[in-house]
Amino acid sequence: SNLSEINQYYEKNIPDADAWLDETETALENMKTILSDIRTQCTYGASDQLKAEDRKTILTQLESLRKQIYSEGNSDYAGRTVFTGYRTNCKLTFMEDESNTEYNIQQKFSYEDIGEHRYYDGQVELKTAEEMSQKVTTSDTKQYTYDRIRLAYGDIGSLKDKDGNEIAVGKTGTLSYHYTDNTGAAKTGDLNVTVYETEDDWKKAVKAGNMPKDGAAFIKSTGELVLGNKASETLKQNKASIELNYDKKGFNSGEVRPEYYFNCTDITDAKNKITYEKYDANGNEIYQDIDYIIAVNQTLTVNTNASDVF
């Protein structure tokens, strides 16, 4: 019996584990090369000598490279995908456009996810050299600088308030954020959020003076939570966390599937909803380690989860 176990380790488990790790390493090396290519393109795109057509070509190349990165996430060993945890029979990304697929997603953020972004208004895009040679009348270009939190997706169907109710476009609802005070006590604060359909709609509100310093704006088309200056400062000072609960219908080919990153529910079929848990009730990640027994009382974890790579 002991000899048969040793043979199993030597002839089957160890070669399988080695092949799985080798496939993962190959995919990661490919991604490293692609990221290097992306950096090269970005550096080249910063040149002042480039024309508009050149930059559009670079943008097309960057979009292609982005797709290549996520296609590596679908790498498999013997037909089993290596970055998808226990769901080795499933792809990491959507393989085709799925306009009717709908998810409810709970995406958690910390204060460290807040980043500064500049928004511009009154821009004019000159498409050709002929247009550039002509006199073009423009409105004054304005710049707005705000901190923001970006969702994993754009084209959001609806954002939920702290009670799980949809915040309608043009309306203001309340989200909750959580932090620990100086005594170690858990605290909860409120953040008022107004929902806008597009970035242009939000810019109109900003120009009208309707962007409160202690509030936020949510832009559905881009999936951005834009923070007022005071609101951002409060979240940072308290080292707060915030969870955004939203629905999204329609996913493009190449987009990552939400279940590998977030707690979410596939609500495409209202009568047969499918719930996925990435984190437990305490916010701890639920790991899906695939272990091979390679010797007596020795196991080796062979898989890497997509959320640790992408």
Predicted segments, located by residue:
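Short secondary-structure capping/junction motifs at helix and strand boundaries
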Residues: 52-55, 68-83, 107-129, 251-256
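Polar, low-complexity export/assembly segments characteristic of proteins
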Residues: 1, 96-117, 217-310
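Extended, beta-strand-rich, solvent-exposed assembly scaffolds of outer structural proteins
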Residues: 141-252, 257
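Amphipathic alpha-helical polymerization modules
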Residues: 1-97
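Polar, glycine-rich mid-to-C-terminal structural blocks
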Residues: 101-148, 165
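Short flexible/disordered coil segments
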Residues: 44-54, 107-121, 154-170, 179, ...
